[in-house]
From Swiss-Prot:
Belongs to the polypeptide deformylase family. It is an enzyme of class 3 (hydrolase). It catalyses: N-terminal N-formyl-L-methionyl-[peptide] + H2O = N-terminal L-methionyl-[peptide] + formate. This is Peptide deformylase. The keyword Nucleotide-binding does not apply. HAMAP family: Pep_deformylase.
């Protein structure tokens, strides 16, 4: 079982590397990593387990956060209608994105960042993702609003980008016009 001790923190070189694509069929180790990542997210959202194991709540995690520079991510997040988006994605890529932008009212956080970073992280409000499941079956997934923000945050990790790289350095509280704010 993964714990917070397994997650690397900002400053670790794996967080700034562009992760390599996985090849299919996946190794048992790559499949286990995906399962463990999703299990971590589920456990971190269970109050009892989170307290017992000292887990910070998370809705997404990428392999580089575990010092594994492979294009693997997991998300476990509900949208505003309580629909669950629970996936392990291999080699995910953004196929398309909306012109409309969105951000979270309180900014973003990250399991690899042990400090609050004020500022808006403006992202696409809707994205379509191409990825593969653990069996190499192609997936085309659409996300909007909060789940779209989460999956973009995790794909950024696969590209060596941290969420705070998107914050306006001169004015972190600057919000461009016509950006939808969630939360």
């Amino acid at each position: 079982m993964l714990t917070m001790d397994d997650i690397v923190r900002e400053g670790h070189p794996a967080l700034r590397e562009v992760a390599s694509e996985v090849t299919f069929p996946l190794s048992d180790e790559e499949k286990k990593l995906g399962h463990d990542m999703l299990e971590f997210l589920i456990n971190s959202q269970d109050e009892e387990l989170a307290e017992k194991y000292g887990l910070r709540g998370g809705v997404g995690i990428a392999a580089p956060q575990l010092a594994v520079t492979k294009r693997i991510l997991a998300i476990h997040v509900h949208d505003e209608k309580d629909r669950l988006y629970s996936y392990v994605l291999y080699n995910p890529k953004i196929r398309s994105h909306s012109v409309q932008q969105a951000c979270l009212s309180g900014g973003e956080g990250c399991l690899s960042v042990d400090r609050e970073v004020p500022g808006y992280v403006v992202r696409s409000e809707r994205v379509t993702i191409d990825a593969f499941d653990e069996n190499g079956i192609p997936l085309k997934l659409r996300f909007k609003d909060y789940p779209a923000i989460v999956v973009q945050h995790e794909i950024d990790h696969l590209n060596g980008i941290m969420f705070y790289d998107h914050i306006n350095k001169e004015n972190p509280s600057y919000l461009p016009p016509d950006v939808d704010v969630f939360g």
